């Protein structure tokens, strides 16, 4: 009696596990490096953006995302720049939603500055997006303009209103900035919680030349948390979100507050994510200069086998942890900008 042998494992069916046993199930994809704001901790005011010809087409982005989903990605986040300023980006989101319908993908989401949500919130909901992150560092209109260099906070507020009206869950991300918005964190938190939105605080990360010293902007969240504990009752939560944030429940508001602390307490031991830039470069670590070109194998063959092999090699080189430091001599730890990598 002859037994049936198991089918041979192919690169496409092989799940992504790095050298340290971490299963890669979360993909962040920057669909553009362009943004309609110029937040000073992210990019310089006269930022030179990539030539549009260098960007992957929307069809190529779809194929790349689909390849990663075939290899075990269950959460896909679109980022930028500002993802919603990419021309025809909704056609990509609508196409990717087929993976939600098939059950291959558990979550399709995005991080946005909120400026385009009035236009796109309902369509995002129709495409199966259930939750989004909105980057907002202040509630003060003048301070918002200072941080973003020319932004209109009313557009963002209207966008948040539109997102919630469409049925999207919204989480607010705020970068903690020394001597700029640190005094406003309690009121920002109370506002977010009053709107049934979690707030996640993020330390400044040393990525890309921004024409200013990040040492002047850096505020350790351990210090900020200690201040908050003087005003509020914070209870640690054992939320396993697969992300870098550590959450607490704020008794006085009933809401959730997250801390992302790459500088003071890294999150590398549980890292389950990789990033793809809008030019098709794969970065397996936010805080390393590692890079694997996926555009070449993507365009070299109409089938995905070469692409899968390139992905497997890159995952096999994923480092154990990042190299972030705040350099008093104003040198970024990583030369590429967050807007290119995907924030």
Curated annotation (Swiss-Prot):
Residues annotated as binding [4Fe-4S] cluster 1 are 35, 39, 42
Summarize where [4Fe-4S] cluster 2 binds, as residue positions.
268, 271, 285
Q: What is its EC number?
A: 4.1.99.22
Cofactor list: [4Fe-4S] cluster
What GO MF annotations does this protein's record show? 4 iron, 4 sulfur cluster binding; cyclic pyranopterin monophosphate synthase activity; GTP 3',8'-cyclase activity; GTP binding; metal ion binding; S-adenosyl-L-methionine binding
Q: Where does S-adenosyl-L-methionine bind?
A: 41, 81, 135, 205
Catalytic reactions of this protein? GTP + AH2 + S-adenosyl-L-methionine = (8S)-3',8-cyclo-7,8-dihydroguanosine 5'-triphosphate + 5'-deoxyadenosine + L-methionine + A + H(+)
UniProt keyword annotation of ATP-binding present: no
Q: Which family does it belong to?
A: Belongs to the radical SAM superfamily. MoaA family.
PANTHER family with a match to the protein in the record? MOLYBDENUM COFACTOR BIOSYNTHESIS PROTEIN 1 (PTHR22960:SF0), MOLYBDOPTERIN COFACTOR SYNTHESIS PROTEIN A (PTHR22960)
Assembly, per entry: Monomer and homodimer.
> Under which name does UniProt file this protein?
GTP 3',8-cyclase
